[in-house]
Amino acid sequence: SDVYKRQGLDDPNIFNIALDGVFDDCQDVVKAVSGDADFKAAYRIGAVNSINWARLMAQVVYYISCWLKVTETADQKVSFSVPTGNFGDICAGHIARQMGLPIDRLIVATNENDVLDEFFRTGNYRPRPAAETMATSSPSMDISRASNFERFAFDLLGRDAAETAELFGTKVKEGGFSLDHDKIAAAREDYGFLSGSSSHADRLATIKDVHERFDYLADPHTADGIKAVSYTHLRAHETRGN
């Protein structure tokens, strides 16, 4: 929106750099800078997206806050459907669950850039090049290389640093990798993950339906999350934690 654009352009302490590419290209630059500790220290550079562990720590807090608001007993479980492209916010949900928060399901909601949905359905992780990343009506999720996914995969692989480095280094550069059925079953059963994707038409239909039923105007990213709940056939009482 125009307001959102002005927030990122008009303040005198902001300097914008334009890249000819997609989100993944921008994130590659941030990762390269973050990987050079001496350069970062010399120029006092930090990142405020979910590459920075501090952001995930803050996001963990609002999973706990949300759980406290909707539950009545200490053992009551809640499921979260999270619109995601970079696997950041939902990675915080995974961390909260590992810390002991009673989370039943974590639903990965993607748009047409469905690399993550494909993984949780099939075990195949195939990051796409920038040229194949689609521009959609939920643009914050127009990402084909999820930087935080490696953090979850580390847990899924038994915290095997060498195997994780091999998969997300050599294998991803070669086009991706596949995990066996047992690992995907563990993602669902041990870590609570489900996934779903939606199209532009799905988002429009969901926004219309929610507005007519609840008099609430959902944004397109929220619509992706709502659609994913329907897609995974999660029962309504589970989303309320009952």
List the predicted regions and their residue ranges:
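Alpha-helix C-terminal capping segments
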Residues: 68-70, 92-102, 227-231
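Glycine-rich phosphate/pyrophosphate-binding loop at beta-loop-alpha junctions
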Residues: 1-27, 79-171
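Generic beta-sheet signal
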Residues: 78-80, 234-235
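Conserved small/polar residues in nucleotide/adenosyl-binding loops
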Residues: 2-7, 232-241
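Gly/Ser/Thr-rich loops at beta-strand to alpha-helix junctions
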Residues: 1, 53, 82-90, 220-225, ...
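Active-site-adjacent helical/loop segments in soluble small-molecule enzymes
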Residues: 31, 35-77, 155-230
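Generic helix-packing signal
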Residues: 30, 34, 97-100, 229, ...
